[in-house]
């Protein structure tokens, strides 16, 4: 039932999950009109359910970041990309590197698999990254939605290839060799001494101890979403918002 019907019949929202779901549906319906409203309404229930689920599994994550990540993921899936994805990792780069700012969720099993530290690029900033880039050689973090590919063993050990799907944000990820890998500088002890984690050349590097299980959980067709300044538009599935260049599209 819609919000007006619920108000007229005196129904109440009993749980946090219900309140989040209804708030999200209401906010999304105000963004679209006409034919777009009909199409969006058909997809809203499942999308709102996933937003509510993630909010329950990862209560420390901000709701707007969850909405953004799920919206970007659903946009990609509506274009036939990652339609079989079961797992989603969300990184919030507005949070200091000294804090855990990466969540890996199994949407199929409805479980939080990891809540972890993650590094940003050395040219992006100190503790909280301020600069982001899609340029080769920038050594800055790229934001937006990524589709995971195969694993390989490289100079940083066991690593995961990433396709950048967000036009203007991360489409050069493969050319930049932006991958997920473990790194000894991703260590809370380092952060305590230096006031920040060690930094990468733009890769979302994680702790060595959890790199392999995290990579194995995310490899081959799942999603990673990196939130930061200016990414709010990525939840809106507009024409040209998705780049499939690195996928051969």
Describe the function of each predicted region:
Residues 12-16, 33, 45-47:
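N-terminal targeting leaders of exported, membrane, and organelle-targeted proteins
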Residues 48-201, 209-249:
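Cell wall/extracellular polymer interaction/catalysis modules
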Residues 27, 31-43:
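Bacterial N-terminal signal peptides
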Residues 1-28:
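N-terminal secretory signal peptides that target proteins for export/translocation
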Residues 5, 41-47, 53:
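N-terminal leader/targeting segments and the immediately adjacent pre-domain N-terminus
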